[in-house]
């Protein structure tokens, strides 16, 4: 009986060690830096148009209209 308990204990320890080493690693979220659009002209009033322009023309991850004194501007977000 003692041999059976030691084998079960050994298997349990091996399973715990295996689970510890096989845990998925989390990738750190990529930080985004914002920059005024270089291709947008005028006041930004359409978030979707700004987003499409940032992605398609400037290669950004996304874009949005943000208020930066004195008016709304199209801001593009790029990986830092």
From Swiss-Prot:
Gene Ontology biological process terms, A to Z: defense response to fungus; killing of cells of another organism
InterPro entries: Defensin_plant (IPR008176), Scorpion_toxin-like (IPR003614), Scorpion_toxin-like_sf (IPR036574)
Signal sequence region: 1-29
Keyword Secreted among record annotations: yes
PROSITE patterns: GAMMA_THIONIN (PS00940)
Alphabetized Gene3D superfamilies for the sequence: Knottin, scorpion toxin-like (3.30.30.10)
Role, per record: Possesses antifungal activity sensitive to inorganic cations.
PANTHER family: DEFENSIN-LIKE PROTEIN 1, DEFENSIN-LIKE PROTEIN 13
Name this polypeptide is given: Defensin-like protein 4
Originating species: Raphanus sativus (Radish)
Taxonomy of the source species: Eukaryota, Viridiplantae, Streptophyta, Embryophyta, Tracheophyta
